[in-house]
Regions:
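Cysteine-nucleophile active-site neighborhood
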Residues: 50-118
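N-terminal beta1-alpha1 cap of cysteine-dependent amidohydrolase-like domains
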Residues: 1-79
Length: 163
C-alpha cells in the first residue's frame, strides 16, 4: 500500500505512522506542500494522511485549497484518510464544514475522551498533545469520535474510512 503523508512543518513528521507502515510493509511518502506546493496524485495514493501544522484552513494559501481538492478526490475514490489537528480541520472544511476560532487555546498534553465505539479497540481516554485554537464542525454523515474538556469536537469518523 502506498501511504502519502502531507506534512505541514519541518519538525512534525509521521513518527509512529512511519514505524507502523514500515512494520507492515507499506510504502510511505512525505510531501511538504507548505514549502513546495507539491501534492501527490490521488491515482498514486492508497491511503492519505494529513498531519497538523501552525496554519489555519482559513489562511489564504493556494496550497491549502489544493490540499482540500486532493482530500475531496480521495473521498470520491473511497480511500482511507487520517487527519490530525490541521488535517482534521482540512477534512472537515473539504466536506463543507466550518472551521473557526474557538475562543480558547489548547496547548500542551491533555486527555481526549472517546465518544463513539465506531472504531474497535480505542481507549476511553488518551492523553494527546494539543496546540490549536481553531475548532471544526463534524461533517454531515460523520460521527463524533473524541472530545476534550475545552472543545467538544476533537475527532470524527466517517464511513469507517475517514478519521
Amino acid at each position: 500500500m502506498r501511504i502519502n503523508v502531507l506534512q505541514h512543518t519541518p519538525n512534525e513528521g509521521p513518527g509512529a505512522i512511519r514505524s507502523w507502515a514500515e512494520e507492515n510493509g507499506h510504502e510511505l511518502y512525505v510531501y511538504h506542500p507548505y514549502r513546495y506546493g507539491i501534492l501527490p496524485d490521488v491515482e498514486e495514493t492508497d491511503m492519505l494522511v494529513i498531519l497538523g501544522g501552525p496554519m489555519s484552513p482559513n489562511d489564504d494559501f493556494e496550497w491549502l485549497k489544493k490540499e482540500r481538492d486532493l482530500i475531496r478526490a480521495a473521498i470520491k475514490q473511497d480511500l482511507p484518510i487520517f487527519g490530525a489537528c490541521l488535517g482534521a480541520q482540512q477534512i472537515s472544511k473539504a466536506l463543507g464544514g466550518v472551521v473557526k476560532n474557538s475562543g480558547v487555546k489548547e496547548v500542551g498534553f491533555a486527555p481526549v475522551f472517546l465518544k463513539s465505539h465506531a472504531i474497535k479497540g480505542l481507549p476511553e481516554e488518551v492523553s494527546v498533545l494539543h496546540w490549536h485554537q481553531d475548532c471544526f464542525e463534524i461533517p454531515k454523515g460523520a460521527e463524533l469520535l473524541f472530545s476534550s474538556r475545552l472543545l467538544k469536537n476533537q475527532g470524527f469518523v466517517m464511513n469507517h474510512r475517514i478519521v
